């Protein structure tokens, strides 16, 4: 695609600094998004998933909708609150998840996923990889997944004032879903109400999976889910719009305490102190426990080994996330070409009725993002970001029982944790013929209040620079160097009421540097290629020592992504490959949980082949995901000690058919994991007790719109 020296072409530089956000009502911005997505290598991709994609698929979680991205991997069995995600091997505590420019980075519990999203409520998903540029927002050191929810204008056809959508689906392994959406407009006002409900039973693993009870069913994997969205918009003028929305995601079911583990795959082990009535120790050594003691397999009264699933303490749990967001957008306001502002509140809660326990994380924030066109070939982006978070455990316990000694001791906990982040940024986009340059600067400041009562604060300056060279009409090269910082993440809210987590006197933000080179090449009108190679370093990474957060870790990562596509008429073929080599280092006897920082994942290949018939309107296709074997370091509870272990490679094939029966009815069919592969994702804790992927799954869903 040729880039001309126009206001459109200069915006390609957002590919180096951040990806663009499209307003489909504005053809200029839509053109910019197309240019950006065609000239960003693999670092930033817009419209990775669109409303149209979601309507013609059976996918009901992020794992499914982002399956074409080889650099993004999901662990955690059938998902929900066990759905762990990595981007280029960087774990969930190093990446961000945003919906409608709202976000929270505080974990409720380290054995639970931080990401909650129902794809049925989404219009589009964009992906950012590596450290973000100045305009990327707070704490984008290793990438982000950014979603935009649907509104009435996205669903109403021209001339339509009211609409209704019904959807229902069924899965053989094992679940069903149903949902409804109503939307309409009257004058300058539009509104949407949407709800989706999903019921998942305990799923079956692939061929050959069996737990120690002799079953092919993964225990404690059943889950009920619901997603609700209410959205109201007002077009104040032709150039200004206000939208108020409230979104809720909720998961409930009897889940394991450590949701990313399936302990029924191993036998119960312990010391003599762990024995219950009728039990005895065998003479078979089972390894060291967390305190370094020798453990042996435990036998029941009949001398038989005992499946270990009770250790995971399954119980009924409700996890809910409520987000309220007020957004304003405007354009053509003198020097300010475009503007967007929002203020939001997020409440994430984890309730365990049997324990009468409720843990909450409260977040409120605001963003102001301004764009100004300067002359014919330049663009200026500037703004401010603010976020405040508070972790509220079920209670503050100044005295509690020590898990190691069993004695009542002072915890040192005095208050709830709080954190405040403020960021200011400016970013220039400068077009000079075939070359487009971007320069940016970001100032970030945090104030952290630990549960010990201690407060620390620190500020960072983060520059960014990038370049796109349109070498030929169909060939462009890009490079960028981005710095970003991340403030200390608050200690998991569920344990913060009786577990001290202090902060060192001179605690600083983590500092990430990401260098990347890439290309985009349209070989012909039918064949396209893209690729990137990156180097990343995160210094002053946060670790713990003596229950204190310290700057005593280093993260390094490097790797590449390559992608290619061919299309001819109704035929499409895509292939992609990604490989990364993240490493973590700790100093001064500090420790960290590797699985939430960086995860060793094997080289990943994604492929897809499809053909779209015009009459009938039918698409048939195949998608494959193939992960090569990799050596990873297991985490606590993996029953594999601390030595590196080999994670097996695997390949999973999905077949699908999408039939648009008429303009109102869409029918989707799929066979996921068609060959019933028994596999374990690499994007979770390594070891024998990590969750197995779901086995063969026949799916069908229908969407009716009128």
Set out the residue ranges of the language-model regions.
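N-terminal Sec signal peptide and the immediately downstream disordered periplasmic leader
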Residues: 1-73, 155, 183-184, 226, ...
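Conserved C-terminal beta-signal and adjacent last beta-strands/turns
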Residues: 2, 6-11, 21-23, 221, ...
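Acidic, small-polar-rich N-terminal luminal/periplasmic segments of exported/outer-membrane proteins
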Residues: 25-157, 174, 259, 323, ...
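Periplasmic-side early beta-strands and strand-to-turn transitions of outer-membrane beta-barrels
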Residues: 153, 159-164, 181-313, 629
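Face-selective signature of the C-terminal outer-membrane beta-barrel domain
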Residues: 241-249, 313-482, 530-533, 567-569, ...
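Outer-membrane beta-barrel signature, preferentially recognizing the C-terminal barrel domain
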Residues: 310-333, 413-419, 456, 470, ...
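Surface-exposed extracellular loop regions of Gram-negative outer-membrane beta-barrel proteins
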Residues: 349, 392, 397, 401-404, ...
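Gram-negative outer-membrane beta-barrel transporters
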Residues: 376, 431-437, 525-539, 544, ...
């Amino acid at each position: 695609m040729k880039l001309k020296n126009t206001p459109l072409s200069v915006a390609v530089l957002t590919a180096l600094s951040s990806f663009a956000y499209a307003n489909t009502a504005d053809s200029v911005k839509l053109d910019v998004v197309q240019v950006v997505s065609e000239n960003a290598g693999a670092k930033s991709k817009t419209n990775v998933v669109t409303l149209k994609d979601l309507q013609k698929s059976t996918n009901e979680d992020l794992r499914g909708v982002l399956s074409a991205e080889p650099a993004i991997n999901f662990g955690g069995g059938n998902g929900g609150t066990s759905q762990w995600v990595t981007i280029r091997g960087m774990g969930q505590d190093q990446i961000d998840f945003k919906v409608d420019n709202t976000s929270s980075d505080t974990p409720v519990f380290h054995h639970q996923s931080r990401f909650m999203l129902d794809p049925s409520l989404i219009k589009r998903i964009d992906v950012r990889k590596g450290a973000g540029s100045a305009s990327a927002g707070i704490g984008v050191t290793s990438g982000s997944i950014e979603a935009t929810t649907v509104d009435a204008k996205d669903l109403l056809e021209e001339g339509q004032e009211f609409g209704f959508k019904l959807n229902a689906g069924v899965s053989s392994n094992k679940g069903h879903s149903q949902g409804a959406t109503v939307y309409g407009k009257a004058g300058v006002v539009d509104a949407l109400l949407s709800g989706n409900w999903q019921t998942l039973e305990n799923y079956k693993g692939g061929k050959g999976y069996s737990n120690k009870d002799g079953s092919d069913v993964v225990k404690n994997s059943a889950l009920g889910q619901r997603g609700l969205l209410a959205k109201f918009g007002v077009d104040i003028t032709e150039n200004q719009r206000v939208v108020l929305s409230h979104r809720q995601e909720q998961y409930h079911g009897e889940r394991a305490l450590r949701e990313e583990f399936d302990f029924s795959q191993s036998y119960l082990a312990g010391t003599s102190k762990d024995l219950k009535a009728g039990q005895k120790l065998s003479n078979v050594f089972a390894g060291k426990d967390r305190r370094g003691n020798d453990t042996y397999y435990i036998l029941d009264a009949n001398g038989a080994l005992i499946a270990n699933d009770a250790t995971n303490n399954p119980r009924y749990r409700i996890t809910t996330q409520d987000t309220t967001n007020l957004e304003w957008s405007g354009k053509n306001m003198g020097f300010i070409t475009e503007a967007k502002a929002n203020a939001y509140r997020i409440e994430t809660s984890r309730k365990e009725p049997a324990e009468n326990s409720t843990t909450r994380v409260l977040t409120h924030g605001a963003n102001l993002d301004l764009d100004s066109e300067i002359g014919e070939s330049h663009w200026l982006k500037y703004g401010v970001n603010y976020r405040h978070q508070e972790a509220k455990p079920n209670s503050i316990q100044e005295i509690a029982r020590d898990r190691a000694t069993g004695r009542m001791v002072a915890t040192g906990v005095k208050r709830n944790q709080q954190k405040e982040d403020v960021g200011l940024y400016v970013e220039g986009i400068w077009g000079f013929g075939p070359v487009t340059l971007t320069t940016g600067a970001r100032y970030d400041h945090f104030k952290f209040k630990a549960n010990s009562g201690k407060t620390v604060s620190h500020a960072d300056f983060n520059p960014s620079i990038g370049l796109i060279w349109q070498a030929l009409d169909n060939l462009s090269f890009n490079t960028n160097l981005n710095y970003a910082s991340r403030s200390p993440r608050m200690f998991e809210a569920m344990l913060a009421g009786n577990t001290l987590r202090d902060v060192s006197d001179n605690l600083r933000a983590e500092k990430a540097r990401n260098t990347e080179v890439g290309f985009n090449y349209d070989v012909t009108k039918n064949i396209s290629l893209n690729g990137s190679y990156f180097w990343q370093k995160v210094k002053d990474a946060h670790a713990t020592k003596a229950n204190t957060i310290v700057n005593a870790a280093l993260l390094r990562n490097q790797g590449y992504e390559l992608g290619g596509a061919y299309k001819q008429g109704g035929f499409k073929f895509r292939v992609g490959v990604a490989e990364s080599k993240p490493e973590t280092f700790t100093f001064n006897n500090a420790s960290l949980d590797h699985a939430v920082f960086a995860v060793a994942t094997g080289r990943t290949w994604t492929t897809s082949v499809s053909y779209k018939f015009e009459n009938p309107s039918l698409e048939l296709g195949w998608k494959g995901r193939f992960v090569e074997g990799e050596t990873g370091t297991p985490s606590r509870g993996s029953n594999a000690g601390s030595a590196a272990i080999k994670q097996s490679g695997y390949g999973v094939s999905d077949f699908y058919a999408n039939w648009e029966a008429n303009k109102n009815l869409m029918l989707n069919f799929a066979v996921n994991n068609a060959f019933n592969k028994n596999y374990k994702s690499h994007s979770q804790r390594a070891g024998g007790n990590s969750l197995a992927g779901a086995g063969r799954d026949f799916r069908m869903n229908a969407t009716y719109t009128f």
